Amino acid sequence: MSAQVMLEEMARKYAINAVKADKEGNAEEAITNYKKAIEVLAQLVSLYRDGSTAAIYEQMINEYKRRIEVLKELIPADGAGNGNGKHSQVSVDDLVMKEKPKVNFNDIVGLEDVKEALKEAIVYPTRRPDLFPLGWPRGILVYGPPGCGKTMIAAAVANEIDSYFIQVDAASVMSKWLGEAEKNVAKIFNSARELSKKDGKPVIIFIDEIDALLGTYNSENGGEVRVRNQFLKEMDGLQDKSENFKVYVIGATNKPWRLDEPFLRRFQKRIYIRLPDIEQRKSLLLHYTSKIKMDNVNIDELAKMTEGYTASDIKDIVQAAHIRVVKEMFDKKLEQPRAVNMEDFKEILKIRKPSVNSEVIKVYEAWHEKYKAL
């Protein structure tokens, strides 16, 4: 598994554990897990500061920190966990990304079908709403295995249409107070509509790991059902033709099967971000190897050898091959590293396997065939 994907999955695990404890009123355990998630996300920011998702990681860190402060107010001095601190009312200003995402469609290698689907659903209606008398999709679900660029594609859309970008997750909505979580959902959507109306700019509400917030689970309480119902109500409100708000909801998930059918119907576009095919792998390899010195590397052969690898995996393979020759330079006390050759890639592929199991891909394919909506 690639380092970035591994860290993202670790942060996600801690965040899910934090939200679970949060829902159960266990503030101390929630704080512990939010802090662990922050530590991992901070590592991601440090390692991938120049990456297109660094700003999103930082946004998540800030949201988890805010949630920790709220939870601390709920813990009395004796640590019993039943304090009467302030309610968890979401501040939408804190969820709006202050800086425009740096990534655009040109930065995304491959995924042409995905980009075209998003242009049809969001870019064209935003630029020429007069050409869409029947309206256009307001809900877009992007799904697929980790490491295939779901978060990056959402950020790129926001850049393409110069929109406000509101990032939402379970931590920003959660509350132990009865009725507060659904009020938070309503507040997010109301603020998005007000922003769009005031400035005439589109607004994207991006919900990462949407299954954690709105998926169906065996052990859930009435509050989670109410949040889902409120969300469905707000999604229906976006379709009101009497109000031409340019507000879109993009949900991203690695587990689309956690979402029930009434919820899926609100997402008129359901876009599967697959593992890269051979042409996309070739494009990815050309893109990443353009930054390093190479000698006698057959990109076509390498593209065949990397079948089953994610885009993130391929980046890590190129990085590992380059690190291999740098290590050799230090070991042999040379002045400069030699060029990376085909043998370097073959050696790396012996010790780096795809981060996504082929059996899991079959599950994605089966779900896609049943629910696809491009």
UniProtKB/Swiss-Prot annotation:
It comes from the Archaea. One of its GO terms (biological process) is cell division. Pfam families: AAA, AAA_lid_3, MIT. Its main location: cytoplasm. The MIT domain is involved in interaction with CdvB. Belongs to the AAA ATPase family. This is Cell division protein C.
